[in-house]
Amino acid sequence: MSAAFPPSLMMMQRPLGSSTAFSIDSLIGSPPQPSPGHFVYTGYPMFMPYRPVVLPPPPPPPPALPQAALQPALPPAHPHHQIPSLPTGFCSSLAQGMALTSTLMATLPGGFSASPQHQEAAAARKFAPQPLPGGGNFDKAEALQADAEDGKGFLAKEGSLLAFSAAETVQASLVGAVRGQGKDESKVEDDPKGKEESFSLESDVDYSSDDNLTGQAAHKEEDPGHALEETPPSSGAAGSTTSTGKNRRRRTAFTSEQLLELEKEFHCKKYLSLTERSQIAHALKLSEVQVKIWFQNRRAKWKRVKAGNANSKTGEPSRNPKIVVPIPVHVSRFAIRSQHQQLEQARP
């Protein structure tokens, strides 16, 4: 394998003006014909079967020579077909300096520019053994031409595979690399979405106690012993969201009739039993959890009012002398009147 590299390296290092350029044509015996125009490099590696912009007419091989003479002449000119990965040698220099390669390709008159069909046949050699059974494919020149046509069709499919199997080498085509990058970016984009969704679910579960709770923090601080009489508010909030089917952050929109009945029940009885709660929820077409949380919030407001009244009675300078509890307009006059009576009775 190492003995196949010196001919190509010698060809690249040999002065360009020499008439005895090492090429397939010189091996066959016909003199190298000068190309009609300069070889325009299209940006792809020389062994890929992409056609250049200017295609010089290839010299036909002499029919007098047998096919056996053509077969051993191909491997020395194209030694890289025997090595699929091409980690060292001429192709590694291609990866390091593409500008030098393009200039050499443009100035060579008869070496590579005069044999595009051999390039296609060589590329077909590299791509064809995977889908086709190897061995007897390259015994005849007709097989080379058929494989050259097949290599064109296989190039688009094999390019994406090369981008993953041999991404470090020069053979990875631009299409395969772009597809590989697109897949990686899609994976990277999918992962943060999954993380954000899981984080949002966790955050909703952690902060589910905020749903429909306006004064729950003050309620916990003022009366820690009262928590034994009630179920934890977080489980109640989770139950309310599952029963109502609404978003966790959205408040429950009570109607004026529902608020009126709830205010009446609260002034009659501050704490409800399970049967009373179920009856009120059934009558108002609410869930028991919604009724329970409304009563918790209402008790928190009521205790804040009581705390303000106690401070004013004892003569201690209260930080908030007047606690105004906002009551909606559609609440009954009975509830408003009872609030005013409590505030007036608290004053000396």
Curated annotation (Swiss-Prot):
Its main location: nucleus. Residues 59-81, 111-139, 179-251 are annotated as: Disordered. Keywords: DNA-binding, Homeobox, Nucleus, Transcription, Transcription regulation. The keyword Nucleus applies. Residues 181-198, 218-229 have a biased composition (Basic and acidic residues). GO terms for biological process: autonomic nervous system development; axon guidance; branching involved in blood vessel morphogenesis; cerebellar granule cell precursor proliferation; cerebellum development; forebrain neuron development; inner ear morphogenesis; midbrain-hindbrain boundary morphogenesis. The keyword Transcription regulation applies. Residues 231-245 have a biased composition (Low complexity). It holds the Pfam family Homeodomain. It is found in: Nucleus. Residues 247-306 bind DNA. GO terms for molecular function: DNA-binding transcription activator activity, RNA polymerase II-specific; DNA-binding transcription factor activity; DNA-binding transcription factor activity, RNA polymerase II-specific; RNA polymerase II core promoter sequence-specific DNA binding; RNA polymerase II transcription regulatory region sequence-specific DNA binding; RNA polymerase II-specific DNA-binding transcription factor binding; sequence-specific double-stranded DNA binding. Coiled coil: none annotated. InterPro entries: GBX-1/2, HD, HD_metazoa, Homeobox_CS, Homeodomain-like_sf. It comes from the Eukaryota. GO terms for cellular component: chromatin; nucleus. May act as a transcription factor for cell pluripotency and differentiation in the embryo. This is Homeobox protein GBX-2. It comes from Homo sapiens (Human).
